[in-house]
Amino acid sequence: MKTFWNTQGGLSQLTEWQPNCWIQVTCPTEDDQRELEEKFNIPDYFMSDISDTDERARYEYDDGWMLIILRIPYVKEIRSRTPYTTVPLGIIHKRDITITVCFYETNMMIDFVSFQQKRGEGFTDHVDMIFRLFLSSAVWYLKRLKQISMLVDKAKRNLDKEVNNESLIGLSRLQDSLTYFQTSIRGNETLLSKLKFKLQIDELDADLIEDVNIEMTQARETTLIYSNILESTMDTYQSIINNNMNTVMRTLTSVTIIMMIPTLITSMFGMNLVNGMEEKPWGFIIAIILSICVSGMCWWFFRHKRLV
């Protein structure tokens, strides 16, 4: 899907392309990609690089065309292997042509358009737009981190009631998401530091870059804090599970030993050995009483040693 935006004096939608407008491309089909490449002579590998979900944040310049790939947050289904992940957003520019391409429909881009329309100022140039996209991505990383924090708290409350596999698997998935966030944010920070020297920056852009740096730093540090907390939480519950397992094994071993004593004593009386009670009518009662006494002593000993 292609949308044309007039970026001068506010963000308003156009019916067709005009010089210096912004072309927003979301979930492009093969026909959309082919049309853009043929109409604007975009290098053919630009689209394939942007479509690669594992493509790192980077800057590239080819025959007058500039390609910037930014990693932005994206939410899958909550029960998926990684509910929160990141996807590439491509920014393509040459002279009066500015195109953004994302192969996923993200809340960040929807919010970006809505926010710029509320501002009613548009963009001063393509550099201003690029850094505002950086700022929006940092803000949305923080939003998604708050959601992850809420899911972690919910899982911890469930685990406090009962240690179950579903909650532990959920925490593990969120840990994977934080790893993706941390890697992508660092890549965006590295890209931002390079763009400071690649693009022509005026005083307004410098102020905007400072805001982006602040938000990026906060997002990175927040991700690191949540990751450390989640890792510590996982280690704690792993220790609890191991401790519970050890307790169960000690109890089973102790009960097995206690249950083995009557069998051992009655087996001794059942052997063809002379013990002086073969002809006594109360021999069986003595064997039972002896088994109970020895088992009781073993039970008391294990309880005293906190083995059961």
Description of each model-found segment:
Residues 1-197, 201-203, 211, 215-218, ...:
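Peripheral, non-transmembrane regulatory/ligand-interaction domains of membrane transport proteins
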Residues 41, 217-308:
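Hydrophobic alpha-helical transmembrane segments and their immediately adjacent juxtamembrane loops
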